[in-house]
Each structure stands twice: as C-alpha cells, then as structure tokens.
Curated annotation (Swiss-Prot):
InterPro entries: NusB-like_sf, NusB_fam, NusB_RsmB_TIM44. The keyword Transcription applies. Signal peptide: none annotated. This is Transcription antitermination protein NusB.
Length: 154
C-alpha cells in the first residue's frame, strides 16, 4: 500500500526541484558541463540544498531532471521566446546568468509540464526570483514568464 504525501510536502519538494534546476542550469552555463554530468552531481551530492548550502526540504528528483533536460532539449525555442521579450537590441548575455537560468527553467516547465497550470508555474518562479533578486527584477521575471507561458502553450 502506498501512502500519499501531504500536499505541502509535495509542494515543498517541487519547489526544491525548481531551485535545484535553476542552480544546475546556472552551473552548466558557467562551467560548460553537460546536463548528464550536472544532473548526476546534483543527484549524488546537492539535491535538497538551498542557495547557501544548507539542507532544505527534499527535492523531487524527477521534476528536477525533467526541467534540466527540457531546457537542453528546447533551448533554442526557449531562448528565442526570451529574446522576443527583451528590449530591442538586447542579447541574452545582457541578463544576469541566474536570471537566464530561472527564465529558461520556467519556460521549460511551460513546455514539458502541460498538466500544471500557468498560474502555478508563474507563482513558483516569481517566488524564486524574489529569493535571488530585488523587487524590480522579480517583476521583470514575472512579466517575461507570463508572456512566454501564453505563447509557449498556444
């Protein structure tokens, strides 16, 4: 007999997976490590650790892997969608590397996790944006993700 996890435990595990995915994507960009190597490293040593290295709620490993792999699989489409929301003449490299990772992860969930509502994905990534950035940058992430979500799911 399987026992269902309470909603808030499941929600916390999914939030942990999203945080880990943003961290992994950031690391992949900075070190040029492959998705496979980065996922393996996180699964063995770092999944479930916060930005400062302290333990947080166990992260959902399946969601973590899905987000990272979806970014890799759909990166051209995702980056095109992000670029379409930037000011004319801006390049992706003008964005902070953590912001790029966060926007890519959110976009990947819009593509790969049709079972989740736009509102849930948006709320989770805006919450993460508040963890990393000031209010202005969190509002920027909100606007970009909200517009991308509509287009990526259309």
């Amino acid at each position: 007999m399987t026992q269902e996890m309470p909603f808030d435990v499941t929600r916390a595990r999914r939030a942990g997976a999203r945080l880990a995915a943003v961290q992994a994507l950031y690391e992949m960009e900075q070190t040029e490590k492959s998705a496979r190597a980065t996922i393996r490293e996180f699964m063995e040593d770092r999944l479930g650790l916060g930005p400062d290295g302290t333990p947080v709620e166990d992260a959902d490993p399946d969601l973590f892997k899905s987000i990272v792999n979806s970014v890799v699989e759909h990166q051209a489409k995702i980056d095109t969608a992000i670029l379409a929301r930037l000011a004319e003449g801006w390049k992706l490299t003008r964005l902070d590397a953590t912001m790029r990772a966060l926007l890519r992860a959110g976009a990947a969930e819009f593509i790969a996790h049709q079972e989740l509502s736009d509102a849930i994905i948006l709320s989770e990534y805006v919450s993460l944006a508040h963890d990393f950035f000031d209010e202005g940058d969190a509002k920027f992430a909100n606007a970009v993700l909200q517009n991308m979500g509509r287009d990526l799911r259309a």
